[in-house]
UniProtKB/Swiss-Prot annotation:
Glycans are attached at residue 22. It holds the Pfam family 7tm_1. This is C-X-C chemokine receptor type 1. It comes from Rattus norvegicus (Rat). Disulfide bonds join 115-192. Belongs to the G-protein coupled receptor 1 family. The gene is Cxcr1. The chain crosses the membrane at residues 45-71, 81-101, 117-138, 160-179, 205-225, 248-269, 291-313. Residues 72-80, 139-159, 226-247, 314-349 are cytoplasmic. InterPro entries: CCR1-9-like (IPR050119), Chemokine_CXCR_1/2 (IPR000174), GPCR_Rhodpsn (IPR000276), GPCR_Rhodpsn_7TM (IPR017452). GO terms for cellular component: external side of plasma membrane.
Length: 349
């Protein structure tokens, strides 16, 4: 194999996390590199604050979504099971944000085991998110276009579908965790990064390609086809009630695409660059790195947006949440009156 071409310049101050946080190609480890000066990423303080805000909103919002769905056990639908799994995925991802925020500020100080764990949770969240949305699109298509309660509508089978989705997400995410480790490049701070040699570079490109196909392009195609056919049926049959019920799902899918599609398109360009299918130049590399930096932040924000959609678009969610809140207040009032009554009896007798 021909030697890999490197257009990399290490900043003298050694701020690797800021300069190279989103590079996905193989890193050189020697002292001399091709002189390609990188444009530094700025506003790290703002990024850290943003991560902290997303973490808090995601933790609170997704916990409430899980509470509402678990509370309505008797009336829980198939779609609710998928939404519950979406909330779990976003909640797990939010747990990685404190580590990512610290790494933006101080570099990776948590060692290789946590580097692998955080990378795994981050990737599993993304893959499981889009795969679960694809499952929801198929479920809605079968329920509305074919107007049937097939075997896929049975709750026990849906649980197996969700388990399969998590399993596939784990398989697609494993390469990212396997290759990542706490790495200290020449004249730079430690970073959680994929350390690859020349022998594994082609394997990594292949794995990235498979991830793009099975973890993004194929589920996206399934969603577009299923929702296209579902929308056509809804408008032809004038199903107003079902059309209103679909707005929440459409909003969830739309927000997911707006947040995650830009990052994946840039990541696909980065993969093509690493595979030498498009010419690697300093200007192109810098443009892709900056685009990855920005679109990744946009993608992270998705983990806290679904609960907002359920709250403002989903009438059923608001009703159930207010019902839970009313029950809690009612129990608190009863407990207070009961305690007051016991105190009065004790005082009298």
């Amino acid at each position: 194999m021909a030697e890999a071409e490197y257009f990399i310049w290490i900043a003298p101050e050694g701020d690797f996390e800021e300069e190279f946080g989103n590079i996905t190609r193989m890193l050189p480890t020697g002292e001399y590199f091709s002189p390609c000066k990188r444009v530094p990423m700025t506003n790290r303080q703002a990024v850290v604050v943003f991560y902290a805000l997303v973490f808090l909103l995601s933790l609170l919002g997704n916990s409430l979504v899980m509470l509402v769905i678990l509370y309505r056990r008797r009336t829980r639908s198939v779609t609710d099971v998928y939404v519950l799994n979406l909330a779990i995925a976003d909640l797990l991802f939010s747990l990685t944000l404190p580590f990512l925020a610290v790494s933006k500020w101080k570099g990776w100080i948590f060692g290789t085991p946590l580097c692998k764990m955080v990378s795994l949770l981050k990737e599993v969240n993304f893959f499981s998110g889009i795969l679960l949305l694809a499952c929801i699109s198929v479920d809605r298509y079968l329920a509305i276009v074919h107007a049937t309660r097939t075997l896929t509508r049975k709750r026990y089978l849906v649980k197996f579908v969700c388990m399969g989705t998590w399993g596939l997400s784990l398989v697609l995410s494993l390469p990212f965790a396997i290759f990542r480790q706490a790495y200290k490049p020449y004249r730079s701070g430690t970073v959680c990064y994929e350390v690859l040699g020349e022998a594994t570079a082609d394997l990594r490109i292949t794995l990235r390609g498979l991830s793009h196909i099975f973890g993004f392009l194929l589920p996206l195609f399934i969603m577009l086809v299923c929702y296209g056919l579902t929308l056509r049926t809804l408008f032809k049959a004038h199903m107003r009630q079902k059309r209103r019920a679909m707005w929440v799902i459409f909003a969830v899918v739309l927000v997911f695409l707006l947040c995650c599609l830009p990052y994946n398109l840039v990541l696909l360009s980065d993969t093509l660059l690493g595979a030498h299918l498009i010419q690697d130049t300093c200007e192109r590399r810098n443009n892709i790195d900056q685009a990855l930096y920005i679109t990744e932040i946009l993608g992270f924000s998705h983990s806290c947006l679904n609960p907002v959609i359920y709250a403002f678009v989903g009438q059923s969610f608001r009703h159930e949440f207010l019902k839970i809140l009313a029950n809690l207040v009612h129990k608190e009032v009863l407990t207070h009156h009961s305690a007051s009554f016991r105190t009065s009896l004790t005082t009298i007798y």
